[in-house]
């Protein structure tokens, strides 16, 4: 909640949230089941009544790029409040600024962590403020950052409690669960803070496997396969090696097995030379699961200390 509890019309960040939430919702396209002209007009009216945001009919169209940008701006806004104050600083000094360089080097309030000569004329220096000498920054607010992340987790825990042992996998803002014939389905809606179905209404997951946090794959009723592994670029070549079948094989048959994928043009940063260049990168994939205790001779996990 980004409004003042005493005055719902006094929004601290309302304008910012409304702008990018509007862009995100419009670029998501029409929701499943909204097909007729009457359905579309009713959807716009319901959204305005619920969120106080007026969607533009002509602007509602699937645009993955715009949706990603709007989502990034919404999410990074909260992270900014929790940003560390004492971030490393970079300074460049020309040969005519030797006095400034030495003032920085011997400043008792600064800790110089690195410097090197770029060329005959320029010097590059990295430094940060020492301990309790960090200046107060009024653009950060740890209380807002903590409240936002805690509130999101409370919503997640509430859903996990309702689903119980039906849960197969969950992350910060997503849950994959088993749905039986008589099981009650969580409510989905297109509004802020509510659940949305990431699959089409006429499709569902039939096989699922996970090799750890942010590391899972599944196959749907319609035959679509999805594989998501943090830190791995799954372009066409790599997806021939890392996919649903290969992950399932590792988890169910040989959990010590490793797979190697290659990125022929990895963008690498060379700090000392302050340059970017492409290089060949080889990465190994293997089962890594250390956040919960794995129950022996099963695929169940339990929290540590349970």
Residue spans for each PLM region:
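Conserved acidic
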Residues: 1-306
């Amino acid at each position: 909640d980004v409004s003042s509890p005493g005055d719902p019309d006094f929004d601290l960040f309302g304008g910012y949230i409304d702008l990018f939430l509007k862009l995100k919702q419009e670029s998501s396209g029409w929701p499943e089941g909204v097909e007729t002209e009457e359905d579309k007009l009713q959807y716009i009216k319901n959204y305005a009544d619920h969120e106080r945001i007026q969607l533009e009919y002509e602007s509602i169209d699937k645009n993955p790029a715009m949706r990603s940008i709007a989502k990034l701006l919404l999410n990074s806004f909260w992270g900014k409040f929790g940003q560390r104050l004492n971030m490393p600083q970079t300074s460049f000094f020309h040969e005519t600024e030797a006095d400034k360089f030495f003032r920085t080097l011997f400043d008792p309030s600064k800790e110089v962590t690195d410097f090197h000569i770029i060329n005959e004329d320029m010097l590059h220096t990295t430094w940060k403020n020492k301990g309790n000498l960090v200046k107060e920054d009024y653009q950060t607010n740890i209380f807002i950052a903590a409240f936002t992340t805690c509130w999101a987790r409370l919503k997640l825990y509430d859903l996990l409690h309702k689903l119980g042992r039906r849960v197969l996998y969950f992350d910060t803002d997503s849950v994959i669960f088993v749905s039986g014939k008589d099981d009650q389905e969580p409510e989905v809606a297109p509004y802020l803070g509510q659940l949305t179905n990431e699959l089409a209404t006429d499709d569902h997951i039939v096989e699922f496997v996970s090799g750890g946090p942010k590391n899972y794959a599944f196959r749907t009723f319609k035959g679509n396969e999805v594989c998501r592994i943090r830190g791995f670029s799954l372009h066409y070549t790599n997806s021939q090696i890392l996919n649903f079948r290969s992950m399932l094989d590792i988890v169910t048959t040989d959990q010590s097995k490793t797979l190697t994928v290659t990125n022929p043009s990895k963008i690498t940063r060379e700090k000392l030379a302050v340059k970017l260049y492409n290089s060949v990168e080889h990465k190994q994939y293997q089962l890594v699961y250390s956040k919960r205790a794995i129950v022996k001779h099963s695929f169940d996990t339990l929290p540590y200390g349970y």
